[in-house]
Amino acid sequence: MLPQFEYGDEVRLIRNVRNDGTYPGMDTGALLIRRGAVGCVYDVGTYLQDQLIYRVHFLNEGRTVGCREEELILASAPWIPNLFEFRDNVIATRSLAVRGQVLVTRGQLGSIMKVLRDESELGIQYHVHFGDGLVLQVPEQSLVMAETEAAMEVLDEL
């Protein structure tokens, strides 16, 4: 088990990191560091002898956090920030259809369930819950944050 990152490497967090109960002074589940933050590796260890854990200092956030290898990429690697996060309320900027049947109308409110960053050729996409158990995979450009000026413009055009 060789580490992918070395001491002093600048790395970027690709997932939000929340307190699992081991970070002092913060509630369990509290957001520690947002995806996209850049930090510096200054220690490498293991957890349960099968996971590499990197101690990363995030200077801008003023925190040092333990990160798993799959949560990090080199800071120099390509990165596109996402506009929305889990539980954000969004509005569809266009009608969404599956096999020709419109399931979501333009202006319909939804809630982000998951951020999908691994579809590089498709850009950032999201699993969005639009009510009645309907969850669709939607590209970022088809959504706007609810209760913003852009959302009001979409609703005004209806």
Swiss-Prot record:
GO biological process: nitrogen fixation
Pfam family, one: NifZ
Keyword list, A-Z: Nitrogen fixation
InterPro entries hit by this protein: Nitrogenase_MoFe_mat_NifZ (IPR007415)
Family: Belongs to the NifZ family.
Name of the protein this chain belongs to: Protein NifZ
Species in which this protein is naturally found: Azotobacter chroococcum mcd 1
Gene responsible for this protein: nifZ
